[in-house]
Curated annotation (Swiss-Prot):
InterPro entries for this protein: HemC, Porphobilin_deaminase_cofac_BS, Porphobilin_deaminase_N, Porphobilinogen_deaminase_C, Porphobilinogen_deaminase_C_sf
Protein name per Swiss-Prot or TrEMBL: Porphobilinogen deaminase
Pathway: Porphyrin-containing compound metabolism; protoporphyrin-IX biosynthesis; coproporphyrinogen-III from 5-aminolevulinate: step 2/4
Record gene name: hemC
Provenance organism: Burkholderia thailandensis (strain ATCC 700388 / DSM 13276 / CCUG 48851 / CIP 106301 / E264)
Family note: Belongs to the HMBS family.
GO cellular component: cytoplasm
Length: 329
């Protein structure tokens, strides 16, 4: 496709809304470069923005409003026309988009695993009792408490560079990060070990980039279509369906990961208490050819988790989080 074959109504300029962290800008530039290659006559620009999630660094996301803190400002730019599309790490996108917005494209996935990063130790198993390990998510915290109760797990906020700086100055013996971000920024050498998905099930959408637009922008959706990876989209749709059905958010240690094995999509979902004392898991697979198939697969896994008691865990955690937010207001 070239500019001569594009519908006349499509704009000559596209503006991408992005957070201003180094990783977020890399992701936006990745999309910009792909669009420029597809449409060299189009002027593709990036609008860097600071979100509320970037500004609140003294509390965990579960205590200040969750994943929506990273996308609301970008959605405002889509709504008022300052931007045509917004690029997100899909794991940071709420399971239910606000009315008036749509996920137009999901790009091919980077490594979805969690990474162990340390200057002094080769793995989680090598850490001594009482070693301080930093993590930004309740999901990883629950995993660490379940598998490594001897460790001192503490919150870790800030962008990727800030987290690494906190490790380097000695605040933590080790930290757990998404492997995808490290690899995208050329920091794979910082990874001491990659955690197997059986040991640390990733968050829904981890490693995938999602491109959001204002609903009704069929022109922008058409331009983004070549960037859409169908296999990745079905996998993350199934993952997000698990979280959506259970009301998953930053308040809940909920994980979901789907992988293709031949023509079958294999999905695993997990819910746990924050202390790791109780961990529920469910699996299912299907020949998911459509988004509806992926949704059904996700629902099968969420239904099984509910049969195991996941709803009671989720409801208790959401209630506790609401009380904590009320108390801190």
């Amino acid at each position: 496709m070239n500019s001569e074959t594009l519908p006349a109504e499509l704009p000559a300029t596209l503006t991408i809304a992005s957070r201003e962290s180094r990783l977020a800008m890399w992701q936006a530039e990745h999309v910009r470069d792909a669009l420029r290659k597809l449409y060299p006559a189009c002027d593709v620009k990036i609008l860097g923005m600071t979100t509320r999630g970037d500004q609140i660094l003294d509390r965990t996301l579960s205590k200040v409003g969750g994943k929506g803190l990273f996308v609301k400002e970008l959605e405002s730019a889509l709504a008022d026309g300052r931007a045509d599309l917004a690029v997100h790490s899909l794991k940071d996108v709420p399971m239910e988009l606000p009315a008036g917005f749509a996920l137009a494209a999901v790009m091919s996935r980077e490594d979805p695993r969690d990474a162990f990063v340390s200057n002094d130790y080769a793995s989680l198993d090598a850490l001594p009792a009482g070693a301080v390990v930093g993590t930004s998510s309740l999901r990883r915290e629950a995993m660490l408490r379940a598998r490594y109760p001897r460790l001192d797990v503490r919150p870790l906020r800030g962008n990727l560079d800030t987290r690494l700086a906190k490790l380097d100055r000695g605040d933590y013996a080790a930290i757990i990060l998404a492997a995808a971000g490290l690899k995208r920024l050329g920091l794979a050498a910082r990874i001491r070990a990659l955690l197997d998905v059986e040991d640390s099930l990733p968050a829904a959408g981890q490693g995938a980039l999602g491109i959001e637009i204002a609903a009704g922008r069929a022109d922008v959706a058409a331009w983004l279509a070549p960037l859409h990876d169908h296999a990745t989209a079905l996998a993350v749709e199934a993952e997000r369906a698990v979280s959506r059905a259970l009301g998953g958010s930053c308040e809940v240690p909920l994980a979901a990961h789907a992988v293709w094995r031949g023509d079958e999509l294999h999905l695993t979902g997990s819910v746990s208490t924050t202390d790791g004392a109780r961990v529920l898991a469910a699996r299912a697979q299907s020949r998911a050819a459509t988004a509806a198939d992926a949704l059904a697969l996700g629902r099968a896994v969420s239904d099984e988790l509910e049969r195991q008691g996941a709803r009671a865990i989720v409801d208790a955690l959401v209630a506790a989080s609401a009380q904590a937010q009320k108390g801190g207001a």
